Amino acid sequence: MTAIDDARYMDLALALAQAQQGRTAPNPAVGCVLVRQGRIIATGATQDGGRPHAERVALDAAGDQAAGATAYVTLEPCAHHGQTPPCAEGLVQAGVARVVIACQDEYHEVAGRGVAILSDAGIVIETGLRKAAATALYCGFFQRLSSGLPQVAVDLRAGLYDAELTAATPEAAKAQIHAFSAAGMNRVRVAPDHPLAGLDWAGLLNT
């Protein structure tokens, strides 16, 4: 596989993740592409509500063809036993030969452990491909992990957004924004004529 091929497959994984943004809370939206002998054999994205995870979706679709394949994932595969088994272990059990990861997961129960599981199993690991794009995709998730606060960007243009602010007071707006964050929504629109359009949002979120 060439570097151009790697970038193309990771771009597809990022697009799959982006398409699920705002639908996977409390988990981040992840994309996964499985490639074998230069051919895409399966794709997956984190499903609504946060599970199944992207890797599980792709592995289930690929079946036995996953053996010897390369997996392109936008975020480090999970390593802990929660409501589902670790995706890192699933990749090992499926016989995946190589895993390309865009960025490391900052969640304390993963944070390098997923990579360690894969590496210990003899899987070739490459990290950092399209890292900037992946970090931008997960900026809200990482912010919530580090501070407990949502990361909110206010766009006054009527473009694509996950939700629209309707609260009319700062107190109500704060509650509504945190509700949006809990639901995994990252892009909130404030209409230009909204009474809170000129509010200091950083101050709002930290009060």
What is each stretch, according to the model?
Residues 22-26:
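Short loop/turn motifs at secondary-structure junctions and domain boundaries
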Residues 42-44:
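Short hydrophobic alpha-helix segments
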